[in-house]
Amino acid sequence: RLVGGGSGDADWRAQWEEADRVAEAVHAREWDGIDAEVAVGDEGTTDDETAIEDVDAGFHEGDALRAVAEALPDPATLFVSNSMPVRDLDRFVGPTTASVTALGNRGVSGIDGIVSSALGARAGTTDDLTLVLGDLALYHDSNGLLAVERCDADATVVTVNNDGGGIFHKLPIESFEPPFTESFRTPHGLDFEPLAALHGLEYERIDARPDALADRGESPAERADAVAEEVAAAVSRSHEEPGSHLIDVETDAEASHRTRERLAAAVDDAVHGDAGGE
């Protein structure tokens, strides 16, 4: 048994709390399209406009997680898949005062059995369940949807559908084609609407890929907001209506990965300022 003693190093803790606040401010600027100044420790303030001027590339997969979280009923159970969804939840979704139970399978990479685990959790609670997972995770455990009818486990299933394994963009192999696409990304081209019909789920497709966003607003921020509102509205409707729902959010894995990279660089610049270049 581990026993913690003392209050720890207050200055060390304060530095991390400040860094977290700065990161949230940078993400908020990307999310809301607002101008802001970000306080950075004892060194005064730094205008984060320069740090993130190239970040706002429109809707990305982290926005999907945030939109889902903000549309949850209270109380609610949120089950988030391994791989990129749980990472995006950790990075882009802030704390809430709502009564939300967040669940996930052990580990951050393996995607087997996600649907079954989530619907098993639904069978043990009276809260509305929202499951967020990737398209490969849904494909791997699609037969788990049998529990919707057999166990009377109504659920809202949100698929972040980038047609393959988006997480592998984080590996050096992404620079090598065709092996990267054929053996790592493994695009499948599946249409999940018939799967929803097979298991009696209402189906809704939201195309959030860059080529489909031209009519959603004049700027990237406006287009991102429009799609986020569409995702949030779909989640809200699904919990107001009877039965189970599959909300299929089609995204671009590479574009989302590049946005994550730019956001990470912007946060680093905002936290460290010129010190990072010394």
Feature map (PLM): residue ranges:
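Short amphipathic alpha-helical segments
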Residues: 3, 25-41, 264-278
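Hydrophobic alpha-helical scaffolding
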Residues: 2-12, 51-58, 79, 182-186, ...
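Conserved alpha-helical scaffold segments that buttress catalytic/binding sites
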Residues: 11, 17, 27-28, 181, ...
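Active-site pocket-lining segments that scaffold enzyme catalytic pockets across diverse folds
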Residues: 20-85, 253
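Thiamine diphosphate
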Residues: 45-46, 66, 88-278
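Glycine-rich, acidic loop regions that bind phosphate or pyrophosphate groups
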Residues: 1-25, 148, 219
